[in-house]
């Protein structure tokens, strides 16, 4: 037995609570009119007219108490209204025509620019609708060729309400020793702000062959986006603006293709199998990006992919002191033989920010694909699914250039936290890293093409720069799923 000892760790405090008052409402109205009719058994005509209107408002007392401008913004509801329509015509299930339009209004724009008109057209042709095609090509069950072109508007350009308005700010002490109040332009409004418009083009083909055992769909698309909302960067300082205004100045295109295919075969009345696959490929290019005038063309964002990784081109590792002396000066702290050697892109004899170039796409896959199938025997089904990516770039250093702020290199980079962290066996292995001959006793370990630079204690500024040295092809193929299904006959349940 023993005695329970009690020790006072914290002083008692009164119970506290918080209270938040928040109100939200939304009103939505919509109506729709449909029309459909078939004439002479060959002409199919349908139409749709759709109207909607919405209004929503969020009122937060904390915001109301703190900021007069925010209170004013939240006092005005967020409102939209729009009218859209579609006319569809089909002739003998062989020729198709779709006409669409959208007339949408948003409160995010100034009066006169609030409504945008966005038309679209789509056409389709089914060659298998002809009798002679079915007779000449009996193995072709269905074939459709289609294309579309249309525009889509975007008003979600910024998180700020009414970006076309210029906001004023008041304060005390106007400078130069004065204590008088002042009024200044806090935000310059984009008074000519308009809808961001995407022009979308798509061409596709669909087919069913061999008694509909083989089915496929393939699409090719091209999108051109104009009027991307960006902060102006080319206004000179002598304009006297503390904050740059925004405008519809950005342009970008994206393009790609996607499709799927499947094949089903009955072996006998109890046994069959299905094979299927799909893919998606996409890429983009910035046509105009608002930025200050750059010294070198490769520093421009225009002409390159959106959010391209930018960094230094690695030339391997410094072989020895003579190699360092004969190379351009690198401005990332001290460096020794075995450290990463970078390319002097502009040829000025110094490696600095002016030598950063676009290295590759960002680290999302440009190509995604999958394939699999099922094998069926009576009530038993076995299935398998594979997924993979291609054209995927990855770097073992974060793209902000600071290893201690990102997570890409964690567990892979020695002493990731500066003077703390792990050293993986793959890095410590002398066959994978540059090692001085004075330590290994073998001159061949001073390999300028080693997978890793010299092993150094603490953060090495020279080796932590974002560069092609840390590039890794991140494509993969994995077994996503294996399934086994058995259907119990209804009579046994």
Regions found by a protein language model. Give the residues of each.
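Extracellular/periplasmic, surface-exposed regions of secreted and cell-surface proteins
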Residues: 1, 5-310, 462, 466-493
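Short, surface-exposed charged micro-motifs
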Residues: 86, 332, 372
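A short local loop/turn or secondary-structure capping micro-motif enriched for an aromatic residue
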Residues: 106-107, 225-226, 361-362, 391-393
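C-terminal beta-signal and adjacent terminal beta-strands/loops
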Residues: 138-141, 225, 285, 374-465, ...
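Glycine-rich, charged/polar anion/phosphate-binding loops
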Residues: 187, 355-359, 366-371
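Conserved small-residue
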Residues: 250, 264-363, 394, 401-404, ...
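P-loop NTPase catalytic cores that bind/hydrolyze ATP
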Residues: 278-280, 367, 371-381
């Amino acid at each position: 037995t023993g005695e329970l000892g009690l020790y006072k760790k914290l002083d008692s405090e009164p119970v506290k609570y918080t209270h938040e008052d928040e109100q939200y409402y939304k009103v939505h109205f919509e109506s729709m009119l449909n029309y459909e009719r078939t004439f002479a058994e060959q002409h199919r005509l349908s139409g749709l007219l759709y109207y909607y209107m919405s209004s929503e408002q969020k009122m937060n007392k904390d915001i109301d108490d703190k900021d007069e401008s925010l209170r004013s913004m939240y006092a005005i509801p967020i409102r939209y209204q729009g009218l859209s329509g579609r006319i569809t015509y089909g002739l003998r299930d062989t020729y198709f025509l779709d006409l669409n339009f959208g007339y949408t209004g948003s409160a995010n724009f100034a009066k006169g620019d609030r409504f945008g008109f966005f038309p679209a057209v789509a056409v389709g042709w089914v060659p298998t609708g002809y009798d002679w095609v079915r007779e000449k090509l009996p193995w072709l069950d269905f074939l459709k060729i289609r294309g579309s072109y249309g525009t889509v508007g975007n008003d979600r350009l910024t998180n700020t309400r009414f970006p076309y308005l210029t906001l004023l700010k008041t304060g005390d002490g106007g400078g130069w020793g004065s204590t008088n109040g002042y009024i200044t332009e806090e935000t310059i409004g984009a008074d000519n702000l308009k809808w961001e418009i995407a022009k979308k083009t798509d061409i596709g083909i669909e087919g069913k062959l061999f008694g509909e055992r083989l089915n496929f769909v393939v699409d090719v698309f091209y999108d051109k986006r104009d009027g991307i909302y960006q902060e102006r960067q080319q206004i000179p300082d002598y304009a006297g603006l503390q904050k740059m205004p925004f405008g519809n100045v950005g342009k970008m295109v994206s393009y790609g293709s996607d499709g799927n295919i499947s094949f089903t075969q009955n072996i006998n009345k109890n046994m069959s199998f299905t094979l299927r696959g799909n893919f998606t490929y996409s890429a983009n290019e910035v046509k105009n990006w608002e930025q200050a005038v750059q010294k070198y063309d490769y520093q421009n964002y225009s002409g390159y992919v959106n959010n391209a990784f930018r960094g230094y081109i690695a030339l391997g590792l410094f072989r020895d002191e003579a190699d360092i002396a004969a190379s351009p000066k690198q401005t990332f702290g001290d460096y020794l033989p075995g450290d990463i050697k970078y390319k002097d892109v502009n040829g000025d004899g110094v490696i600095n920010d002016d030598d950063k170039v676009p290295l590759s796409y960002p680290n999302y896959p440009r190509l995604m694909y999958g394939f699999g199938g099922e094998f069926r025997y009576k009530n038993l089904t076995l299935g398998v699914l594979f997924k993979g990516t291609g054209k995927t770039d990855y770097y073992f250093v974060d793209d902000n250039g600071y290893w201690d702020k990102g997570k890409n290199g964690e567990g892979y980079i020695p002493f990731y936290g500066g003077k703390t962290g792990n050293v993986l066996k793959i890095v410590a292995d002398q066959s994978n890293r540059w090692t001085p001959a004075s330590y290994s006793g073998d001159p061949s370990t001073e390999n300028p093409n080693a997978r890793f630079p010299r092993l150094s204690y603490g953060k090495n500024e020279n080796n932590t720069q974002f560069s092609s040295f840390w590039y890794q092809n991140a494509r993969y193929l994995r077994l996503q799923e294996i399934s086994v299904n058995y259907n119990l006959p209804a009579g046994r349940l």
